[in-house]
Amino acid sequence: MAKAATPKETAAAKKPAAPKKAASAKTASATTVVAATGAVGRVTQVIGAVVDVAFEEGQLPKILNALETDNNGNRLVLEVAQHLGENSVRTIAMDSTEGLVRGQKVTDTGAPIAVPVGKETLGRIMNVIGEPVDEAGPLKTSARRAIHQDAPAYVDQSTEAQILVTGIKVVDLLAPYAKGGKIGLFGGAGVGKTVLIMELINNVAKAHGGYSVFAGVGERTREGNDLYHEMIESGVNKHGGGEGSKAALVYGQMNEPPGARARVALTGLTVAEQFRDEGQDVLFFVDNIFRFTQAGSEVSALLGRIPSAVGYQPTLATDMGQMQERITTTTKGSITSVQAIYVPADDLTDPAPATSFAHLDATTVLSRSIAEKGIYPAVDPLDSTSRMLDPMVVGEEHYEVARKVQGTLQRYKALQDIIAILGMDELSEEDKIAVARARKIERFLSQPFFVAEVFTGSPGKLVALEDTIKGFKGLVNGEYDHLPEAAFYMVGSIEEAVEKAKKLAAEAA
């Protein structure tokens, strides 16, 4: 049985270890780091992803420090989560702990996990600790950044409300994204989440010269692999990175231990923060934010914390808040985050999605019924929301046009039951006009994507916000009532719809 520490010993343990050699021309803080670095401990207990390590007196690593050990020839990183007393720490493993044994040596790096950052990460896939996993050689960058950072201070944040123009009509008109905002992307399987994400990456690179970072958190490895190859096929990235690559990928997929899944979103965010601090407008994608919470809950139980509601970790709101508050606009640049959100059992009151909702500025809802009509992007114009759709932010004209478009679509939705039972002939003249306009609006909300050119054969279109407003304003005011519905399907600006109508008329003649 371990002997209880005397008050004298306890006081000694609290003191930082005295450096073995006097560090010449170094500050006191730097000396402390040097003293802590290289401290060697030994594994005392392994429970799944949680590993306990004992250190010599006075050499205890700080909370969140990265420890390293060799696991059958592989570098295994452990992150300090708790100080247990008796000079022991409890750590979370970032990879599988199979093969670890008690008594094994563990070295303190003296700093949190740091990952490569900068342009060299574009086109590459990294894991949670910044190692390349795309079999394209080492990452050629010396710049590294710790994954645990404080949120920007109030004085460094930009308070101006600006919209990020994506070039996608339905998003820019009805649920615009805030620069430095957070967007929730809701949608089932096969409705076009990945294609929409890739188009956003492409358009932000073209329109703003900005980069994107994609964090795959606890999703299927197959999907991550597909996304990587689709990005290469559509020209968003090049294999092995290099000139022309627009996105960095960071993966911690379903097969990874909970430690990796709980930290991989922070690794991706750190890469995005570096681009922001270099003056870029960055898009940061997280697929799926629910898995970040789920991994935190697994780790929490292993650390011996008492669970809160529905078995989630007691620190749920804190974990989410610490990450989300780092996603913001500063005076240098912005990080706009698009987060895919899985809702367990479609229960929106579940603590995990409910905690995410509190941080969102906009929601983009993809609908299967719209996808079934062949309208892509399959964004639901009545279900998607944004707090940026405010006359004070987007202007009076944009706001009025958006509300009229939604009003027309809502009226069409209300009339659909009558049309299904009695047919169009039973509607009043006014309702017939409203339905005809709504059907044209529905089709005009579709748009050919650059990244889908390979499949559709139609050249992609990036539509300026002014052209989007002008087109829909004309539609709701009845200026294009004489044009056929087909003219509005899969075009960019309203001028293209008019041209298409002329072509259709010529073909019919």
UniProtKB/Swiss-Prot annotation:
Enzyme Commission number(s): 7.1.2.2
Annotated region (Disordered), positions in chain: 1-28
UniProt function note: Produces ATP from ADP in the presence of a proton gradient across the membrane. The catalytic sites are hosted primarily by the beta subunits.
Predominant location category: membrane
Record InterPro entries: AAA+_ATPase, ATP-synt_VA_C, ATP_synth_F1_bsu, ATPase_a/bsu_AS, ATPase_alpha/beta_chains, ATPase_F1/V1/A1_a/bsu_N, ATPase_F1/V1/A1_a/bsu_N_sf, ATPase_F1/V1/A1_a/bsu_nucl-bd
Alphabetized GO MF terms: ATP binding; ATP hydrolysis activity; proton-transporting ATP synthase activity, rotational mechanism
Subcellular location: Cell inner membrane
One cellular-component annotation, GO: plasma membrane
Organism: Sinorhizobium medicae (strain WSM419)
Domain of life assignment: Bacteria
Membrane topology of the entry: Peripheral membrane protein
Name of the protein: ATP synthase subunit beta
Protein family (similarity comment): Belongs to the ATPase alpha/beta chains family.
Residues that, per the record, bind ATP: G187, G188, A189, G190, V191, G192, K193, T194
Regions annotated as coiled coil: none
Name of one Pfam family that matches: ATP-synt_VA_C
Keywords linked to the UniProt accession: ATP synthesis, ATP-binding, Cell inner membrane, Cell membrane, CF(1), Hydrogen ion transport, Ion transport, Membrane, Nucleotide-binding, Translocase, Transport
Catalytic activity annotation: ATP + H2O + 4 H(+)(in) = ADP + phosphate + 5 H(+)(out)
Keyword check for Electron transport: no
Assembly notes: F-type ATPases have 2 components, CF(1) - the catalytic core - and CF(0) - the membrane proton channel. CF(1) has five subunits: alpha(3), beta(3), gamma(1), delta(1), epsilon(1). CF(0) has three main subunits: a(1), b(2) and c(9-12). The alpha and beta chains form an alternating ring which encloses part of the gamma chain. CF(1) is attached to CF(0) by a central stalk formed by the gamma and epsilon chains, while a peripheral stalk is formed by the delta and b chains.
Protein's UniProt keywords contain Translocase: yes
